[in-house]
Structure formats: C-alpha cells, structure tokens
Amino acid sequence: MQWEFAGRLGPEAGRYVVRRYAWDDPRHVVVIGELEAPRRRRLGARRRPRAAAAGSVPDAVDVTRATVIATDPITDDGAHRWLEEAVKERERTVGEALALLNRAIHGHRLAAADPYVGEVSEAMAMATRIGYGSGEQVADGDWEEARELPPPELKRSMLLTPQQRLAALLAGRDVALACEDLALRARLDLDQGRGREAALQLSLALDAAFAELEGWRASEAVATRLDKLHEHREPVASAAAAALQGGLQPEQTEAVEAALQRLEAALRARLAEL
C-alpha cells in the first residue's frame, strides 16, 4: 500500500521495521519518503517578516509518500491474482495498512512528545495505490504492477451536517461538550487498536456525558439513550480498571465498543434536537 499526503506526517524519512514484539520476525516495513516541492523555501532561509503581495500565488507544499510493505513473499504466479483480490477488498486492505502507518505516526507522537502530530485517514490522501514489486522497487515508489484507487466516496449528508454544526458552534448557537471530544478520542484509539487508551478515555467520556447531557433529558430520544447508557457504566469502569493493570480481555474490548456506540447515539440524538 502506498499513499501520498500533502505536508509532513511526523516521522522523518526512512524505513521502519514493524514487529509484533521484540525479536519477532519483521512483519512489515513502513517507508516514509519526501517529495520536495519545487518552490519550497529552505527552512530558515528567511527569518524576518516580509510584505505580503495581494493575490500572490501560494507556495507549493512538500508531499510525503508513505508505503507499507508486507514482508511475506508473493509467488510470481499468484501476484496478479493477489492484486485483484486486494482491490476488491479495498476497505480491508487499505484499513489494515493504514493502521500500520498510523501506528508509526502515533509512535512518533510519543517519541517526539508532540501532541500536535495526528493520525491520517484515507480521505486525506492525495493518492492511494495497491501494488506489488520487489522491496527496493516499492520503497522507491516503483512497482511491477499496481492500481491507483479513486478517493473514497462521502455521502452528501456527511458533507453538509458538519458544516452546519460548525456554523452553529462558531455563531454561539450550540456548545461543544467535553464528552464529545473525549468520545472522539476514544473512537480514534479503539479504531487504531489501542484498547487500553480507549477504555480510559471512554470512562471519562461517560462521566462527562451523564453530567452534560442531563440538560437535554426533556428530549425523549436523549433521555432514552441516556438511560441505556447507564447500563454500560459498570462494564466500562471494569475495562478501565483492567487497562490500568495492563490490558483488556476481548470481551472487555467488545464492552467498550458497545458503550461507545451508545454514547455516539446519544450525542446524535442531542444534535437532532437543535
């Protein structure tokens, strides 16, 4: 899998070996490469402010090429068939590879202690490719055979609703709830396989939700979902306690997912009342 993103993702250009645990055989290699923009100024070349010309052409930005390479070999006879199947199962193929790329980005965020480094989604990519070739070929952006995928489709409702909500937030017609932000962080952690972090985030999100959403209990839809959400408080608290001890059992991860879905439903019900 290979993507091209505008700007920098965080990790420095290089090759990063991914293992399940120390001393395990390499499973994947994440390659971060930079395609320097032709008009990009050198870092530190101009340290003083300058007058901005009206209507000036924006500077081009760097492009980061990120590649996830599986170390499992593919036979020559089965390579083309593998590619066709990978394209057909786009969601799974892209999702698994993107999780590895985001693991590298998340690792950089921790290593650099930089809270502003964020994961990426497929929708953010300027280009998405699936292909096969030798390790050196793929790392250098070349292939024996590849497919460039069209951008993922977004429903019109998904495009309009955030814009309307944003306008309401900025105009003071709506408020941002702490439980919303905590729920989003829990969703990101859960989707990226960070069950411990998701359980801890969700435990706080539920406490905030029970306090913040109480003001909308007059809405039957919100009240019903709040009551159902209370049923998940104990399982989430148990999962959060397990997270502090080291890890979650599969059933606890499922409990976190179920509770998070309930919280997301309650938040949607509140928005429907606006």
Enumerate the language-model features and the residues they cover:
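Charged, non-catalytic interaction/linker regions at domain boundaries
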Residues: M1-L177
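Amphipathic, oligomerization/interface secondary-structure segments
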Residues: P151-L274
